[in-house]
UniProtKB/Swiss-Prot annotation:
Keyword Transport: no
Residues under site feature: Lowers pKa of active site Cys: K165
Keyword entries, A-Z: Acyltransferase, Cytoplasm, Transferase
EC number: 2.3.1.181
Name this polypeptide is given: Octanoyltransferase
GO MF entry, a single one: lipoyl(octanoyl) transferase activity
GO biological process: protein modification process
Reactions this protein catalyses: octanoyl-[ACP] + L-lysyl-[protein] = N(6)-octanoyl-L-lysyl-[protein] + holo-[ACP] + H(+)
Organism: Burkholderia ambifaria (strain ATCC BAA-244 / DSM 16087 / CCUG 44356 / LMG 19182 / AMMD)
Functional pathway: Protein modification; protein lipoylation via endogenous pathway; protein N(6)-(lipoyl)lysine from octanoyl-[acyl-carrier-protein]: step 1/2
Species classification: Bacteria, Pseudomonadati, Pseudomonadota, Betaproteobacteria, Burkholderiales
Misc remark: In the reaction, the free carboxyl group of octanoic acid is attached via an amide linkage to the epsilon-amino group of a specific lysine residue of lipoyl domains of lipoate-dependent enzymes.
NCBIfam families: lipB, PRK14342.1, PRK14343.1
Primary site of residence: cytoplasm
Localization of this protein: Cytoplasm
Length: 251
């Protein structure tokens, strides 16, 4: 069954007066597009085209997608971090920051197409908001996770898999607008990570929520994550009706 993209929009709040009398900035609307299972190159070309053609009036968008198996290598990435040249998984060189990572079924990928100038966001602040959204999402499933200084992404906080990476992050900023985004491992085949130095770190363990004994539904986690992203970007709670479920596979 194919699933058509569905859009939901977070409603901006009205400008009001704070107790100190200074205006409170309204939330900036963002359209969430659920793109289903999509080839990485298709998403990559689409987000570049969206960013290249957007104007000051173009609305912000968040895209949620699941990719067939693919390795992506950041613009300053070292191909030597791909340890097995004939793995059968394609490699795509991209223009985001960071090194090499893997995308595949059972992983949530979220692309953030945001006008940072309009949102008055510094890149470091955006990264912090994204990381916090992932930490909050995992906490909703009773999983403790942390940031690591100098190593963008989210890592398991304690237990047998302490220090293992569960979410990756990489952005590109062009003309004050972001694209690319983050990936969160829910329930996937983790073996392709063994063929790379994930994010350029030799021997870095990569896990998913299933590895941590959380039997989470992909769609439920995706909606929790998107809700937290919107709330953090807006600086307030944000809720939206769930669109129809995406067709995806954890095989």
């Amino acid at each position: 069954m194919s699933v058509s993209p569905v859009s939901i929009v977070s409603t901006p709040v009205a400008v009001s007066e704070s107790p100190a009398g200074s205006p409170v900035q309204p939330a900036v609307p963002v359209t969430v597009r659920w793109r289903g299972s999509e080839a990485y190159q298709t998403s990559f070309d689409a987000m570049r085209a969206f960013t290249d053609t957007r104007t000051a009036d173009t609305g912000d968008e968040i895209w949620v997608v699941e990719h067939p198996p693919v390795y992506t290598l950041g613009q300053a990435g070292d191909p030597a971090h791909l340890l097995v040249a004939d793995s059968g998984v394609p490699l795509v060189k991209v223009d985001r920051g960071g090194q090499i990572t893997y995308h595949g079924p059972g992983q949530i990928v979220v692309y953030l197409l945001l006008d940072l100038r309009r949102r008055k966001l510094m890149v470091r602040t955006l990264v912090t908001k994204i990381e916090e959204a992932v930490i909050e999402t995992l906490a909703a499933y009773n999983l403790a996770s942390v940031r690591k200084a100098g190593a963008p992404g989210i890592y398991v906080a304690s237990g047998v898999h302490e220090g293992a990476k569960i979410a990756a992050l990489g952005l590109k900023i062009r003309n004050g607008c972001s694209y690319h985004g983050l990936s969160l491992n829910v329930k996937m085949d983790l073996r392709p990570f063994l063929a790379i130095n994930p994010c350029g770190y030799a021997g870095l363990e990569t896990v998913d929520m299933a590895s941590l004994e959380v039997a989470a539904d992909w769609n439920d986690v995706a909606h929790t994550l998107v809700g937290r992203l919107i709330a953090n970007l807006d600086g307030e709670s944000a809720a939206a009706d769930k669109p129809q479920a995406l067709e995806h596979s954890n095989d």
